[in-house]
Amino acid sequence: MSIFCLAAYFWLTMVGGVMADNPERYSANLSSHMEDFTPFPGTEINFLGTTHRPPNLALPSNGSMHGYCPQQTKITTAFKYINTVISCTIFIVGMVGNATLLRIIYQNKCMRNGPNALIASLALGDLIYVVIDLPINVFKLLAGRWPFDHNDFGVFLCKLFPFLQKSSVGITVLNLCALSVDRYRAVASWSRVQGIGIPLITAIEIVSIWILSFILAIPEAIGFVMVPFEYKGELHRTCMLNATSKFMEFYQDVKDWWLFGFYFCMPLVCTAIFYTLMTCEMLNRRNGSLRIALSEHLKQRREVAKTVFCLVVIFALCWFPLHLSRILKKTVYDEMDKNRCELLSFLLLMDYIGINLATMNSCINPIALYFVSKKFKNCFQSCLCCCCHQSKSLMTSVPMNGTSIQWKNQEQNNHNTERSSHKDSMN
């Protein structure tokens, strides 16, 4: 419940903060439209236009063409800083939360199993996005231009940014699918108690997920380039998708539908299918004595299934507004419509909400695990308390023959914690 309240808070924050067009805001999302990279106000191309422009594009400065809204729009300073604060909060929470989650799974042997390995893979993908992509987002928001836009490093960032962006989302989507399949396998073989350790098939799945995510993101690295264009008599450069081959033109035409189908619908359909099969298995297999003997084991598996389902629901809530905005823009918008600017205002509002909710998905999974899973909650608390205890011990410990009593006690406490955590490890 706390997770949904947090999401609602950010939603209302963005509704209240959106004042006008945001030409400087590079969207941390699945879209690669030209408007997301153009830092210049006053043109409709900033929001809808097209992702393909010739290298020597000249934009009219009088706004008289049908493709431009008559009134120049600009973003308020307050809205800039609201978005900056939100991005910085997501950066801190995402970095601390995902790094702590990885540390918990790495340091506790009892946590090294199939489901937790997939959750660690999910956290690592989110951590990469938070550490690398979010700082670029904040820079574009405040500076109103692409970083290092006049040298080779800017070109490198122009290709790296969308590549990592799409790879991170692919890692999230495929890990959620793998978790759903893993939960079905666990229930289908519910009489088998899994030991500690990562199964070989799970390790193969994780490697395949990362390789496939990188492969699917290659068109982003190929298509995005620094494109010079003239605006109000000045030559500028911006990072955008510039289709120069038939394949890239095809990719550009079907991109919105491809993103919606593969990166959004697929994990939801996969979860629905395998959770339906899992429910049927649990209803059909009711062996009385064996079921009683494994009742505690089944409770643990149900808790893991509930955790995975919660992660999928959060993913859907965070990404749906953004995909809805892109699909509406693809199907409803008409350049020749005289009332298109009113539609743009509505779609822009949805775009901002979707962008921030989608970005928030990179930091919310550790929070969800804290509230949904008792074992992860205990591990998070133990990890944080351990860090505080270590800091205090370093200041108060008394050396004895080159050692410290506190370190010995801490080692004993860690051994007891690991032994107690082994009793309720996820299966």
Swiss-Prot record:
Phosphoserine sites (modified residues): S425
One protein family per Pfam: 7tm_1
Keyword terms, alphabetized: Cell membrane, Disulfide bond, G-protein coupled receptor, Glycoprotein, Membrane, Phosphoprotein, Receptor, Signal, Transducer, Transmembrane, Transmembrane helix
Membrane topology per record: Multi-pass membrane protein
GO cellular component terms given for this protein: plasma membrane
Sugar attachment sites: N29, N62, N242
Signal peptide: 1-20
CDD domains the record matches: 7tmA_ET-AR (cd15975)
Keyword Electron transport among UniProt keywords: no
SUPFAM superfamilies given in the database record: Family A G protein-coupled receptor-like
Biased composition (Basic and acidic residues): 416-427
Family label: Belongs to the G-protein coupled receptor 1 family. Endothelin receptor subfamily. EDNRA sub-subfamily.
Role played: Receptor for endothelin-1. Mediates its action by association with G proteins that activate a phosphatidylinositol-calcium second messenger system. The rank order of binding affinities for ET-A is: ET1 > ET2 >> ET3.
Oligomer status and interactors: Interacts with HDAC7 and KAT5.
Name assigned to this protein: Endothelin-1 receptor
Source organism of this protein record: Mus musculus (Mouse)
Lineage of origin: Eukaryota, Metazoa, Chordata, Craniata, Vertebrata
Gene: Ednra
